Amino acid sequence: MTVAVKNFSSIMNQMRDAYTGEQTTEFSLAAFIGLQAPSLSDAPDELQKLTQEYQENVNSFYVQEELDLKENVKQLENDKNQTAFFENMRKKKEEALKKSEDMINKYYDSLIDFGEEHPSSQTLILTIADKVGAFIQDIMDKVLNVFVTVVETVKNAISAAINFISSTFNSIVSTTKNFFSSLF
């Protein structure tokens, strides 16, 4: 079940390209290897360690993103500067995407190196890389959606407040007119 080393790097790079950025490109591992996926329980300890380190980096990344987002929202609450908030959210979204891509690139590079050193594990590595890449792409879509939803929520809250003010004062003006017109 060995994939030739020269094809291995190419497949890994095509897979990486499919799972980075805001793309929704589907990657079909079966189209490349034409084999049934090996059991992931057969993964060598070193390969499991590489994947565990990646998981720890990803978890730290998500914790930091959550803290940064909360801080940005608190800053809006304190400073009341919408323009700075929206700009900061845009920058944070771009930074999050870049950090995610950097992490997956580092992970895929380490998998390529490992696979070139251990050709007998290449099919297994391709299977793991495909599963991890697809999962991280789905999760990053959710992370990026948080940025969009927070901005939309703030904009909607501001719009709702303005509509409430307008509606309330229109009602007050109307009630006042009706009151005074009923006096005489």
What are these regions (language model features)?
Residues 1-120, 130:
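Extracellular, luminal, or virion-exposed ectodomains of exported proteins
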Residues 108-184:
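Membrane- and interface-active hydrophobic/amphipathic segments that mediate membrane binding, fusion
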